């Protein structure tokens, strides 16, 4: 029974979307794909409609007349879904053939409301082909080696032995649609929407959802010229400002839950200051080693 709608928000990345598009068309559990074009100027909507003509899965296109941002785009997609589950894709992420089926199976086995597999960076120096999708063997990790609550970050490429409860996961997640009756993506997050995913998963956990990370399947995040335009790209200085602003908002919003569920101590402001000082020290080291560059928000 097809029970999943895939939602793919995108902005001015039709080249990357075309590269990963075949990976979204091979999942028997998927009933429909919805592409949310968030005000693109590169002909994204028209091109996706062309791709839809040969897709084995029905494809809908939601077109925003202007760029509303990632949280609004996600919720636009959710409103179009009618299936029990939704899964968020991205315009520069390639799914393994078993990604949807494995997540659906393990969600049912664990009672998960939300679950995501591993995500591995795929370096694409020129044109994309599947030889770029490299996932070498690596040791199994414990959950406490994956999640770093001192930075609200995680190492989602790491392997774990099976589904593990997660305080937060990355965006390529399978989510029961009824979760959105209690929790929504917060449209306060703007710019590159840094932290909007973490915000959603913390809120979902606080509302009683069961959130899991699993090592049983994988997807690949393309990095290189193919994804060097569009998306949520911002320059480094602006990114660092957003890292401070958005992290402060996140921690103030979720501090009572984080203290109760994860034993964080002190104040949200104190945590944020310590985090940001460590972050800037790391940035100075990086700049000294490799120079100044722009970056992406994800």
Predicted regions and their residues:
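A conserved acidic beta->alpha catalytic loop
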Residues: 23, 37-46, 93
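Short, flexible, basic/aromatic active-site loop/helix in glycosyltransferases
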Residues: 135-165
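Short aromatic/hydrophobic "clamp" motif used to bind/position activated sugar donors
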Residues: 86
